[in-house]
Amino acid sequence: MRVRKRKGAEEHLANNPHYVILNPEDAKGRWHDVFGNDRPIHIEVGSGKGGFITGMALKNPDINYIGIDIQLSVLSYALDKVLASEVSNVKLLRVDGSSLTNYFEDGEVDMMYLNFSDPWPKTKHEKRRLTYKDFLDTYKRILPEHGEIHFKTDNRGLFEYSLASFSQYGMTLRQIWLDLHASNYEGNVMTEYEEKFSNKGQVIYRVEANF
């Protein structure tokens, strides 16, 4: 989801180095040092305005969270939420999801979240989808053996594509929700996008898969 350019976004990020890691390549292999503890590390690729990552951090203080987004303005809004919530277990990165191995050692990340990723519906753009096999190669490297990905979307086409992509890659589809908000699942933390469109009756799909 594209967001209008925000004036002062770059300065906002630069002025908060405690939360925004400006040179994440220097943290590769030492993220536990960055957080100052050895708690599990969960990352969200495409963190948007930060509602999910902040909500998860508040709910699970014993887990370290890293929100990743390439859009400058979007990440600045996520920083607003992190600052307002005063969580101590969140860091933010402005990097591309295809380059994660530049910032994380093999097996350094314990779990991944992909929420409402761009569906890139045109066939010629398949390689840009975050559940395309090349991305899965990257995720498998930075996750531990049998590492988990939790994926949510409101786009039926992307969901079906992702289920097929996970399966063809040899991943295990542990649990699938075809209408998350109509289910009895109690652990859901909503993104801003999810809250907006589910209130309009949009069905939300979810899957937990592991390598």
From Swiss-Prot:
The keyword S-adenosyl-L-methionine applies. It catalyses: guanosine(46) in tRNA + S-adenosyl-L-methionine = N(7)-methylguanosine(46) in tRNA + S-adenosyl-L-homocysteine. Residues 124-129 are annotated as: Interaction with RNA. Substrate binds at K122, D154, T191, E192, Y193, E194. CDD domains: AdoMet_MTases. InterPro entries: SAM-dependent_MTases_sf, tRNA_(Gua-N-7)_MeTrfase_Trmb, tRNA_methyltr_TrmB_bact. Its EC number is 2.1.1.33. GO terms for molecular function: tRNA (guanine(46)-N7)-methyltransferase activity. S-adenosyl-L-methionine binds at E44, D69, D96, D118. Transmembrane segments: none annotated. Belongs to the class I-like SAM-binding methyltransferase superfamily. TrmB family. This is tRNA (guanine-N(7)-)-methyltransferase. The gene is trmB.
